[in-house]
Regions:
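Sec-dependent signal peptide recognition
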Residues: 3-11
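C-terminal motif of bacterial Sec signal peptides marking the signal peptidase cleavage site
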Residues: 15-18
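Bacterial signal peptide processing site
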Residues: 20-22
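Short, charged low-complexity linear segments at domain edges
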Residues: 24-43, 97
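Post-signal-peptide N-terminal segment of Sec-exported extracytoplasmic proteins
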Residues: 37-71
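Mature extracytoplasmic domains of secretory-pathway proteins
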Residues: 57-94
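Short flanking/linker segments adjacent to small metal-binding domains or redox-active Cys/His motifs
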Residues: 99-127
């Protein structure tokens, strides 16, 4: 009888671990996709050359689990197609919101202010 109970406990433990591993693999694939989208956005807006401060902009990007953006991207208006950038950022933000819900994620809930940007040495950067 004791051996039978031990076998059942062991089987339950193995099933629990197997199910837990499956759940941890899925977020990794989704997180890799999110990271790739972020890299594509950074690449799209990488030319930050500017001639004056008015050319430098920021755009909220991503979504914290409790609301608000998870980051900001700095870009040069004269070097970046703002409409295409906004579409890419929306795709990234919507996907991150989806993952927050899907995996029941939490975040720090701190408000992230947009960085103050300027044209420093001919490149848009945060002050």
């Amino acid at each position: 009888m004791k051996i039978h109970i031990l076998k059942l406990i062991f089987l339950g433990f193995v099933l629990f671990v197997a199910c837990s591993k499956e759940k941890t693999l899925a977020p990794t694939v989704d997180d890799q996709k999110l990271e790739q989208l972020g890299k594509e956005i950074q690449e799209f807006a990488k030319n930050k050359a500017c001639s004056n401060e008015d050319d430098c902009r920021t755009m909220a990007m991503g979504s914290k689990a409790c609301g608000g953006p998870s980051s900001y991207i700095i870009y040069a208006l004269s070097r970046t197609n703002e409409k295409q950038l906004a579409e890419k950022v929306k795709q990234y933000t919507d996907f991150q919101k989806e993952l927050n819900i899907k995996y029941n994620r939490a975040s720090d809930c701190l408000f992230l202010s947009p960085p103050t940007v300027d044209c420093l040495n001919g490149v848009c950067a945060s002050k």
